[in-house]
Amino acid sequence: MKNLSQTFLLLLLQVFVFSTHAQKNKAFTPKEVYQSKDLIITQIADNSFLHVSYHQTNDFGNVPCNGLVVRNGHEVIVFDTPTKDNSAEELIKWVTETLHCQIKAVIPTHFHTDCLGGLNAFHQHNIPSYASFKTIELAKEDKMPVPQNGFKDLLTLKVGKKQATARFFGEGHTKDNVVGYFAPDDVMFGGCLIKEIDASKGYLGDANVAEWSATVEKVKAAYPKAKIVIPGHGEYGNQSLLDYTIQLFK
């Protein structure tokens, strides 16, 4: 009887381990959770949300611009603002009223409008902003909204009981482009440093094309576990976006 009980317990343990492993490896099905004419929000992982707003340009038309919201507990961190204050207000309201979360920080990943165009809305809600010292300097020169808190190469912030990071790997799309990462979902926010599959080189007015591929190679080496890679514009995917970007600028 004792041996039978031990065998039964062992079988239960094996079933539990298998079930837990299966749940952990089950693919997440993305779902759109908010849409207006100015902002679309899609849940792309358990605690990661893609936000898309729009920027009217002379050369590329009305461009969709990506950003990321990561969550743990009742706190979130936002990578890149929506492009305008009104769409930023929509995002802030959605996080507050639908997710029931506090925005701990917003992190523009470089100094262009598609990263910090809606920054003033966050400041009006007393949400602290963080960016590299280079981004702050370039934003001032370009008369853009200016992030409040600076860092040199690496920023690590708590969100709930987890961490989110922003890190400078080198020049590419701009002198100041940083990459966001949220390890609990293995999600990378590459911003405009990373291109969607089949994208053109895009705007190069502030780029360092000679260094671009080498910078992305460093990103790839730093985050071998990344499962979701989000470019600044267009469709997100996996690490194939890194490989595509590396080849595009070689």
What annotation goes with each model-predicted range?
Residues M1-N25:
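Bacterial Sec-dependent N-terminal signal peptides
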Residues H74-I77, N86-Y130:
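Active-site metal-binding motif and surrounding structural segment of the metallo-beta-lactamase
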Residues N47, V70, D80, V95, ...:
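Divalent metal-coordination and catalytic microenvironments
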Residues N25-F28, S36-D38, Q43, E75-V76, T83-K84, Y130-G172, D176-T245, ...:
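Metallo-beta-lactamase
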Residues G67, A88-I92, L116-L119, S213-V216, ...:
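Extracytoplasmic/secreted envelope proteins and their assembly/folding machinery
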